[in-house]
């Protein structure tokens, strides 16, 4: 299943990603009339990922547009409030992860797109995804594969239009990805005062 695109693609590029980084720096529910229906837990729901990320594909009526506006507002307020509460150290780690994951996504854009398209033809539960990622990270201790996994899971979240399933996936996968290896990498990269130097991304990655 997931191994068809995760193991055969991400792992195939682990060495390239690691070396590159080292060199650079390092819904339908509301329409259900069966009141006895038992809804599946989020972790047991099947994930389907669409090849198209065009949001207009999901906004066909005025109600769809209004609901999306409300959802965006509520989500943004929640994230903005969370960011305001974060200490400087956490914000500095956010900046580091932004820099590195953006670099991986840009440098390996073609490879990532191949994996996204392959994922679009499959369906998985959150545990399918988590188990595959866990296996990959146990076998590969490099920083590159962890950054690639973050970028990959983030893009899958963009293509999964169900926000409940997306949040569940992000929550569980963040626990799996942030193993001792990744924590050590990020804390080693972080400047002593937990601030990001005011330099270009390229300079910082050298």
UniProtKB/Swiss-Prot annotation:
The keyword GTP-binding does not apply. The keyword Membrane applies. The lineage of its organism: Viruses, Varidnaviria, Bamfordvirae, Nucleocytoviricota, Pokkesviricetes. InterPro entries: Bcl-2-like_sf (IPR036834), Orthopox_F1 (IPR011207), Poxvirus_F1/C10 (IPR021119). Its main location: host cell. This is Apoptosis regulator OPG045. The gene is OPG045. Plays a role in evading host innate immune response by inhibiting host inflammasome activation. Interacts with and inhibits NLR-mediated interleukin-1 beta/IL1B production in infected cells. At the host mitochondria outer membrane, interacts with the BH3 domain of host BAK and prevents BAK from binding active BAX. In turn, host apoptosis is inhibited. It comes from the Viruses.
């Amino acid at each position: 299943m997931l191994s068809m695109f995760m193991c055969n693609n991400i792992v195939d590029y682990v060495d390239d990603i690691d070396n590159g980084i080292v060199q650079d720096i390092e819904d339908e529910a509301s329409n259900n009339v069966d009141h006895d229906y038992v809804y599946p837990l989020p972790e047991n729901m099947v994930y389907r990922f669409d090849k198209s990320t065009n949001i207009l594909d999901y906004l066909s009526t005025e109600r769809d547009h209004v609901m999306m506006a409300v959802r965006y507002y509520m989500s943004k307020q929640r994230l903005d409030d969370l960011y305001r509460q974060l200490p400087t150290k956490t914000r500095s780690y956010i900046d580091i992860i932004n820099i590195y994951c953006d670099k991986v996504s840009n440098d390996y854009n073609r490879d990532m797109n191949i994996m996204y398209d392959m994922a679009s033809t499959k369906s998985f539960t959150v545990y399918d995804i988590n188990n595959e990622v866990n296996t990959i990270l146990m076998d590969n201790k490099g920083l590159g594969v962890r950054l690639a996994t973050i970028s990959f899971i983030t893009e899958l979240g963009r293509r999964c239009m169900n926000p409940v399933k997306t949040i569940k996936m992000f929550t569980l996968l963040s626990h799996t990805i942030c193993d001792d290896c990744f924590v050590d990498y990020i804390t080693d990269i972080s400047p002593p005062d937990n601030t990001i130097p005011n330099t270009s991304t390229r300079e910082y990655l050298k």
